[in-house]
Amino acid sequence: MKMSNMKEKLHTTELYLPNDETIMTEQLKCLDRLYDFNMTRPTELDKRQKLMKEMFAEVGENCYIEPPFHSNFGGKHCHLGNNIYFNFGVTLVDDTHVYIGDSTMLGPNVVIATAGHPILPELRVKAYQYNATVHIGKNCWLGAGVIVLPGITIGDNTVVGAGSVVTKDLPPNVIAVGNPCRVLREINEHDREYYFKDKK
């Protein structure tokens, strides 16, 4: 595999070497911008918004990210809709594309990983990896500490419970929990009446 072709494989799910010089040069520029974002003061909201427009592939209106925010490519491959909220400590392993729909919330320390490594030790020792795009729908809520693995799609309005590890696609309009994450139930009329346990 020629090093000159490595960058082309970032978005194809093919194996590639992430230590390719072209990839690393671009990555470091992105990480410099991310560093600047994380060093902003809480009062520098306008500066944060300006940096977000430079960092992300796409960023909608009224998005808020609480530093520190971690990202392999500083958000370069992340596509954010409108009204998105990231709590502190969110990590996007954005070696390829991550799409997050309007009005979705990510709790503290959520990890969305697009990158994986071969099971075969002989390939892994050579530092090969592959990437698979992640899609998070509109109006989702991923609780604290949720981990989403490469190639996953989560449907609109779905809630993923804190600490869950999402290893398979999740449909829209469900509550899903656990490791591995499984659908607990559909969102229903009970949820219109009670917002938390017995609270109306």
Positions of the model-derived regions?
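Short hydrophobic beta-strand element within catalytic cores of glycosyltransferases
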Residues: 166-167
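Flexible, glycine/small-residue-enriched loop-and-beta-strand segment within the central core
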Residues: 42, 68-80, 85-154, 179-181, ...
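Terminal amphipathic alpha-helical/low-complexity segments used for targeting or macromolecular assembly
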Residues: 1-62, 181-200
